[in-house]
Amino acid sequence: MEIVLGVGGGIAAYKAALLLRLMTEAGHGVTVVPTANALEFVGAATWEALSGRPVRTDTFEAVDEVNHVRLGRRADLVVVAPATADLLARTAAGMAPDLLGNVLLTATCPVVLAPAMHTEMWHHPATVANVALLRERGVTVAVSYTHLTLPTILLV
């Protein structure tokens, strides 16, 4: 299975490294698409070492391949972990300020978002509305009880 692992810019980004390792050990091909803020928590070298592939961050890299469209279309699954409140809001609004946003808009496969944020942010009416809208559109929002860790369902 070809998986795009989007990584949001929250402290839980380091846990996505474990998720990536589990995906690759299970035999999946994984392309990591971190946000700029995610790279502040976990560097590109870590993602590349664990995936065996170059990290994708630039919408305009590999323009001849239409990188921002190809990644979303070729994936069998897109997982975003952690999905910060900001990333949930941008996704719900259909915004694509970076490569990950473009991938989410062009994905024709199942999309799973794993929220990770402080409880106050999770319960904010804007976040609640964004999650409801995403679910209405068919996006799976996998919820943990602490919202600071990646949902256990993603590690299975």
Residue ranges of model-derived segments:
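A short, gly/pro- and small-residue-rich
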Residues: 93-107
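Glycine-rich phosphate/diphosphate-binding loop of Rossmann-like nucleotide-binding domains
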Residues: 1-46
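Glycine/threonine-rich flexible loop motifs
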Residues: 85-96, 121-124
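Glycine-rich oxoanion-binding loops at beta->alpha junctions
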Residues: 45-90
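Conserved small/polar residues in nucleotide/adenosyl-binding loops
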Residues: 146-152
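General beta-strand structural signal in soluble alpha/beta enzymes
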Residues: 32-34, 57, 80-81, 113-114, ...
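Short, glycine-/small-residue-rich phosphate/pyrophosphate-handling segment
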Residues: 108-144
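Residues at the C-terminal ends
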Residues: 25-27, 106, 136
